Amino acid sequence: MSVIIVGGGMAGATLALAISHLTQGKLAVHLVEANAPGAQDHPGFDARAIALAAGTCQQLAHIGVWQALASCATPISTVHVSDRGHAGFVTLTAEEYRLDALGHVVELHDVGLRLFKRLQNAPGVTLHCPDRVDRFTRSEEQVTVTLQSGKQLTGELLVAADGSRSSIAGQLNIDWQ
């Protein structure tokens, strides 16, 4: 069995690493990404920063990914929640919940570099980047994906992780919000 993941942003790259880790490389994963690893113009791994909740960091640690991200992460020790113009607020601290941090802030470009470094050595993962899906066909048993490079990939599962305007989901008439 094999899985073809189209889109190597945060969701696709993390899924590929999770499958590799949880199956110890026994399930073949093909990751197709339009941008070269470390590309400055990667839309999913740009200069934006995101906050990862403590539970997310724990899940990433469980699949062996957090260890690669921790050194570029800034811990969140306090969160202040208020609504301007309205009375009341709440302040949450990691200390009161007996946590090292409520979460961490990471820059997506750093995350992308580190995820792709891990992907290059992940058992069972084959990277196809930069490359794009030209077309695909489905049968009851499998999906065949033809890449713009001419390579053909066959798998039992096709994952559309190619962004909020997924061309793969669109071609399959998958509705989403």
Task: Annotate each language-model stretch with its function.
Residues 6, 18-48:
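Glycine-rich FAD pyrophosphate-binding loop
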Residues 43-84:
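N-terminal FAD cofactor-binding segment of flavoenzymes
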Residues 11, 15:
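Hydrophobic/small residue at the entry helix of a nucleotide-binding pocket
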Residues 7-10, 108:
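Glycine-rich Rossmann-fold phosphate-binding loop(s) that bind the pyrophosphate
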Residues 72-171:
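Conserved N-terminal helical subregion
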Residues 175-177:
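A short alpha->loop->secondary-structure connector
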Residues 22, 63, 122-123:
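Acidic-histidine catalytic/liganding microenvironments
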Residues 1-3:
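Extreme N-terminal starter segment of soluble prokaryotic enzymes
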